[in-house]
């Protein structure tokens, strides 16, 4: 992904050499005058972007050149010298410190009450008087926004949606025909941090939540935005009450998720998957198309297409 300028802005004219000093890099290798103009995940690296990597097996897959890579000594020999490498003990912590310096929220008036005059709202949309609609929000035709809803700056809601009472949406793109249940929170930062001797280092989340057309989200659900990429919910997904979808998750189209399910970070769920109540899925797991996870299943490894887990 690239930095979304509706939500974020990146510091200008920061070179690799500048950043090495900021994050306390022990060594720097390669072209140190590269000016950083974007943030990317490692697998989407492009020239002049900042990325990080701590796994030597993945480090050797880097394609391209002129990126700035926060990494460690183990990965260094595997990265093309046309990139600039900043060496730190913990690349993930170094990356967190780098983002804290480079990326800031785009300026917006968060003191808005009622409907901001800078919001774009279709004439046929219905907005409850107690709802808060911040600047740069877009609401499509026929959409209903109920009492107590808060739509933070930059949120986009398609046509014929229901955003039900007291839900809070930020860093979200919602397609047409969506139904967001009462009290749900979409687009908050995910549960990403590193524990150090000096305390907790929180990892910035600069991604979004992207929800396709005709998705139903139950009451009291939480869907966290992505850390670098997006959290993505496919079309026609049905999600029951009290579910948690963590950062960077992808849920395939037409999947059904019963109440109290928890999906950990960076999980990929295929199309047409069925999850019974209280299913828990561990991070980075892949669930194949059409798989069935029966109630209270704990999934810690990949599941093939069409398999059933009890």
State the predicted function of each range.
Residues 1-3, 24-40, 144-154, 169-173, ...:
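Short, charge-rich amphipathic segments
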Residues 1-118, 177, 183-184, 189-202, ...:
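Terminal amphipathic alpha-helical/low-complexity segments used for targeting or macromolecular assembly
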Residues 7-29, 134-137, 143, 161, ...:
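Short N-terminal secondary-structure initiator segments
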Residues 110-171, 175:
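Right-handed parallel beta-helix
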């Amino acid at each position: 992904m690239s930095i979304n300028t509706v939500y974020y802005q990146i510091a200008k004219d920061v070179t690799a050499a500048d950043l090495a000093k900021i994050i306390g890099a022990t060594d720097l290798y390669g072209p140190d005058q590269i000016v950083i103009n974007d943030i990317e995940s490692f697998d989407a690296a492009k020239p002049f972007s900042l990325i990080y990597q701590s796994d030597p097996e993945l480090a050797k897959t880097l394609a391209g050149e002129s990126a700035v890579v926060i990494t460690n000594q183990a990965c260094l020999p595997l990265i093309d010298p046309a990139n600039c490498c900043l060496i730190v003990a913990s690349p993930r912590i170094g990356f967190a410190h780098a983002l804290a310096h480079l990326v800031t929220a785009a300026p917006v008036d968060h003191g808005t009450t009622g409907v901001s005059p800078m919001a774009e709202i279709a004439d046929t949309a219905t907005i409850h008087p107690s709802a808060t609609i911040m600047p740069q929000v877009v609401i499509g035709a026929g959409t209903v926004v109920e009492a107590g809803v808060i739509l933070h700056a930059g949120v986009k809601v398609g046509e014929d949606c229901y955003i039900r009472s007291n839900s809070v949406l930020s860093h979200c793109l919602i397609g047409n025909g969506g139904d967001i249940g009462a009290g749900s929170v979409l687009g908050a930062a995910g549960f990403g941090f590193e524990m150090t001797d000096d305390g907790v280092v929180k990892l910035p989340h600069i991604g979004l939540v992207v929800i396709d057309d005709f998705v139903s989200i139950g009451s009291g659900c939480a869907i966290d935005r992505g850390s670098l990429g997006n959290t993505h919910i496919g079309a026609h997904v049905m999600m029951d009450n009290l579910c948690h979808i963590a950062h960077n998750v992808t849920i395939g189209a037409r999947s059904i998720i019963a109440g109290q399910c928890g999906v950990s970070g960076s999980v990929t769920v295929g199309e047409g998957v069925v999850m019974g109540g209280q299913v828990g899925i561990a991070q980075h797991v892949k669930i194949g198309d059409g798989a069935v996870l029966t109630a209270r299943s704990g999934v810690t490894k990949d599941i093939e297409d069409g398999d059933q887990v009890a």
